[in-house]
């Protein structure tokens, strides 16, 4: 399989790959590209460009696109569950449930975002603002780096990606190198704006670090302890 950068399926610029192993059998399932720093720069550049156009779409349009994505997931849910079972090692019943959660979470975030309004602060609510009417609007923050751990890749994918997209952000998704295949297949079976979700695959934690210190990437993430400490230390140092 290939990464997706700027709407195109591509190999790593280095040409390097690594194997995804079935933990139950020890056999190779498939080989995937190993991202380089240059790949990440290309992905971020494409995400920044795509986000500007994506942010111009209405919330209703974004919701329609997410609903169409869910239709594709439903049509391919057994294939996705079998892939998740093979690469993650979890029982097929749990894999099917996790794929099913995508069809719950994406519509939920899509509909909630339609009613996620700004705030109007009336006159006189705050001291010194007796004659001032304050309006707070909600704007996209830009590019969000979604770092996905190995244990519940699809659950964490829908909890990170769906709200980011619905609020007009771009999402760069970094799957775990242990099991990236299901999320990559989700990319092949979706109708989201191709410039918005971009996959980076890497065996090394430096890939996470590269994204965490990039000036275009913001947001919250739950990651391995060493990655979290790295992000905090870099952000603390400005």
Q: How would you label these PLM feature ranges?
A:
Residues 1-131:
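N-terminal Rossmann-like NAD(P)+-binding subdomain of aldehyde/semialdehyde dehydrogenases
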